[in-house]
Amino acid sequence: MSVNGENKVSGGDSSSSDRPVRVYADGIFDLFHFGHARAIEQAKKSFPNTYLLVGCCNDEITNKFKGKTVMTESERYESLRHCKWVDEVIPDAPWVLTTEFLDKHKIDYVAHDALPYADTSGAGNDVYEFVKSIGKFKETKRTEGISTSDIIMRIVKDYNQYVLRNLDRGYSREELGVSFEEKRLRVNMRLKKLQEKVKEQQEKIQTVAKTAGMHHDEWLENADRWVAGFLEMFEEGCHKMGTAIRDGIQQRLMRQESEENRRLLQNGLTISKDNDDEQMSDDNEFAEEDCVNVSNKGIETVKK
């Protein structure tokens, strides 16, 4: 793999100003995560013009000196090829760097965090001891809180849940390696689902009860105000109704009086003022009696 910066190299003169600085970073890169990506990014940005080579150890050497990986060497190589900071992937990278390897790939600097990396091969105390001694080591910073070991520990901690999830998704017990525990795990899975349903129903019941309690409290707080408001509106309506009835009766009596006066004048008779006063008094009593009856009926309705 090459980049624009690499194409500028002419011949083998490492002193050329156009030649990018060749930086090498290596690792296992199992379960590639953002901690790996940040370390690679730091290596890439070590110099303004950097060509980054990333070495990845194969399965054989990794299993021998570090332990079993989750991903195969091919999967780990491919993960690195899809990281935007990587210019070139070097498969089958050596566990301990040598002068021959650095010269072969024309490596100017090796990037890694400064913590001593134990050399389990027995060649030395620190895998990067040699490049540090010749001044070709470029320090990067580790990302705290994330590592392949941390991810594996999370899976181990919640092992049963992940097994149950995959059984539920159709994986066989042979694929998961749980042939002796499958029945117990499936029973646990059903019990867990039942517990979740019971919990869900309990939450719904609590929500309904809480809502009902709120409505009950609201009614108790506002009942007196609502009833008082209704009675006030009802009394106002009765008053308006009584006024309308009285006005209507008075207008009718005035029309009757006018017609009677006109008829008596035509007959040449004199209207007696005393008789008129007596009739007006009777009509007013009739109007007041109607208003009282209407008010009494309204009050009886409210009581019901």
From Swiss-Prot:
Consequence of gene disruption: No visible phenotype under normal growth conditions.
Chain sites annotated for binding substrate: K66, W95
A Pfam family assignment: CTP_transf_like
Annotated binding of CTP, by residue: 28-36, 66, 112-113, 117, 142-146
Region (Disordered): 266-292
Entry keyword set: Lipid biosynthesis, Lipid metabolism, Nucleotidyltransferase, Phospholipid biosynthesis, Phospholipid metabolism, Transferase
Superkingdom classification of source: Eukaryota
Family per record: Belongs to the cytidylyltransferase family.
Name listed for the protein in its UniProt record: Choline-phosphate cytidylyltransferase 2
Organism, scientific name: Arabidopsis thaliana
Highest classification ranks of the organism: Eukaryota, Viridiplantae, Streptophyta, Embryophyta, Tracheophyta
